[in-house]
């Protein structure tokens, strides 16, 4: 499956025709902050600016959710994903769910 260029936030892929829509593919990751990470981030907030510990945690969670979405689309028989989106929800104090989802499709080169 999924060449990176065949995953898009748009609902079509230039140069390709969508032959079949297979349904929603999603990847979900639930992460919590460690005590050490929370302490380190608290120190960073004293100085303002980007909190790199949280940025790194968020980026890892998004990447993991993205890869899980690709795996699910592959299991569904898709070779592309359209309408890809991210969502994040704090489900408990310090615990965040990151969801990456889109429509798994079978796409072929147009022409």
Curated annotation (Swiss-Prot):
InterPro entries: UPF0145_dom_sf, UPF0145_YbjQ-like
Pfam families per the UniProt record, alphabetical: YbjQ_1
Listed PANTHER family: UPF0145 PROTEIN SCO3412, UPF0145 PROTEIN YBJQ
Segments traversing the membrane: none
Coiled coil start-end: none
Family of this protein: Belongs to the UPF0145 family.
Gene3D superfamilies named among the record's database cross-references: Hypothetical protein apc22750. Chain B
Cysteine pairings via disulfide bonds: none
Domain of life: Bacteria
Alphabetized SUPFAM superfamilies for the sequence: YbjQ-like
Protein name: UPF0145 protein BMA0904
